[in-house]
Amino acid sequence: MSCLGNCLLKEREPIMYNQEKIKKMKNHELAIEAYFYAYNHKLFGGASQKKAVKCYEQIIAIMDLDERMNLPFISTYGRCYVATEKRLIKCTKKLFGYKIEEQNWNEIKHIFYNNTSSRGALILDTVYGEVKIGVHRDGAGYACEVLRKLKEDAK
């Protein structure tokens, strides 16, 4: 069994799924759920459903057995992110395959967000410098709140 039983959307989990049903879901089904979670909570950006689902499948495949998907979101440039209790994982579609990048919570010093009339941005102050992630303006505040909570819990 892969990480399927533990890759849960912890907060705002869909009511129609119980624990046993989630444990039986395949990576593709979990990736679709992650995409629709991001879409329904205005955490989506410039990626098609097909591209986002493929990226989420790549992320789910590398997750540890004890990790859960706490916050899946998609940047305005089509990069897919998943925040877990341990780290922030980013997947980017390249010409030949996918590129996965990870940042542990101890590498991120501060998390901010900024909204304008047309777009939102998550700003991560990391040990490597400032990282800006363009997101939907309506979901930036919620995403920032969840990321801060995960960072605080990881201490």
What name fits each language-model region?
Residues 17-19, 99-155:
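Acidic, Ser/Thr- and proline-rich intrinsically disordered linker/docking segments
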Residues 7, 12, 17-81:
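Anionic N-terminal interaction surfaces
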Residues 39, 43-44, 81, 89-90, ...:
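Short, surface-exposed beta-strand/loop "edge" segments at domain boundaries and coil↔beta transitions
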